[in-house]
Swiss-Prot record:
It is found in: Cytoplasm. Its EC number is 2.1.1.177. This is Ribosomal RNA large subunit methyltransferase H. It holds the Pfam family SPOUT_MTase. Belongs to the RNA methyltransferase RlmH family. NCBIfam families: PRK00103.1-3, tRNA_RlmH_YbeA. GO terms for cellular component: cytoplasm. One of its GO terms (molecular function) is rRNA (pseudouridine-N3-)-methyltransferase activity. It is an enzyme of class 2 (transferase). Keywords: Cytoplasm, Methyltransferase, rRNA processing, S-adenosyl-L-methionine, Transferase. Specifically methylates the pseudouridine at position 1915 (m3Psi1915) in 23S rRNA. It catalyses: pseudouridine(1915) in 23S rRNA + S-adenosyl-L-methionine = N(3)-methylpseudouridine(1915) in 23S rRNA + S-adenosyl-L-homocysteine + H(+). InterPro entries: Alpha/beta_knot_MTases, RlmH-like, tRNA_m1G_MTases_N. The gene is rlmH.
Length: 159
């Protein structure tokens, strides 16, 4: 199975890079895992609604360019469906069982995801109504993917 996380912007924080590297190493037992960064759109602090949509559209085009037709896409979105770790693990298992070998997770920039990216997504997933930095979300997501594989393997990581 191939798992990819597409994130907007370059990860700068050393502690997040280290955390993601640790989960990437652990995930190597279960899948081919990669993080793909697409450049964020430079924008002034105050934007009109039209300018905000323009930023999301440009970032969305960069995201969509990294997704192949056969990939199953999860968009991280506040309006997405919340899942327990066990439900998420079951989804990952079912996707693999039914022949999906390429799974992509998309994390938008500070303004969120474009309508085009949300439309391309096979499903939307939410980690709750909290607002988290999108850079931190990469590590949280990598941990949950690892947790899902550990649950499916019957290993004692998840309590």
């Amino acid at each position: 199975m191939n798992i990819k996380i597409i994130g907007v912007g370059k990860l700068k924080e050393k502690y997040l890079k280290q955390g993601i590297a640790e989960y990437a190493k652990r995930l190597g037992t279960f899948c081919k895992f990669q993080i793909v960064e697409v450049p964020d759109e430079k924008a002034p602090e105050k934007l009109s609604p039209a300018e905000m949509e323009g930023v999301k559209e440009k970032e969305g085009e960069r995201i969509l360019a990294k997704i192949k037709d056969k990939e199953y896409v999860y968009a991280l979105a506040i309006e997405g469906k919340e899942r327990s770790s066990e439900e998420f693990a079951k989804e990952l298992e079912d996707l693999g069982t039914y022949g999906t070998s390429d799974i992509t997770f998309v994390i938008g920039g500070s303004l969120g995801l474009s309508p085009e990216v949300l439309k391309r997504a096979n499903t939307k997933i939410s980690f709750g109504r909290f607002t988290l930095p999108h850079q931190l979300m990469r590590m949280v997501l990598a941990e949950q993917i690892y947790r899902g594989f550990m649950i499916n393997a019957g290993r004692p990581y998840h309590k």
